[in-house]
Amino acid sequence: MIDAIQSIGAFSAVKETEAAGSSSSASLATPGTGAAAPQAGSFAEVLGNMTTDAIRSVKSAEGVSLQAIRGEANTREVVDAVMSAEQSLQTAIAIRDKVVTAYLEIARMQI
């Protein structure tokens, strides 16, 4: 079920953005000192990792649910896995809402 989501190709857009961001991250050195700022990862990289973790969490919950149907997992394991997947999904929805709100606010700005 979740495999269909991965085939959409959203990760290719993240990789393109990441490649564009990596060329500009080299210019983040502190002026005058010659020392580079510590690399924390680009925004696209962080979002990509969060998306991958969310997908992994949902897949895990699906797997545990199937194990419970076969009688190989107990109810507590299923509930824990589903709650973790739900938390990941709610986080992804909240981030999406914030990004959309920021985009709409930028679109309303007068130039």
Curated annotation (Swiss-Prot):
This protein's UniProt keywords: Bacterial flagellum
InterPro entries named among the record's database cross-references: FliE
Compartment list: Bacterial flagellum basal body
Single GO MF annotation: structural molecule activity
UniProt keyword Transcription present: no
Pfam family, one: FliE
GO cellular component annotations of the record: bacterial-type flagellum basal body
GO BP, sorted A to Z: bacterial-type flagellum-dependent cell motility
Keyword S-adenosyl-L-methionine in record: no
Family: Belongs to the FliE family.
Protein name per its UniProtKB record: Flagellar hook-basal body complex protein FliE
Organism annotation: Sinorhizobium medicae (strain WSM419)
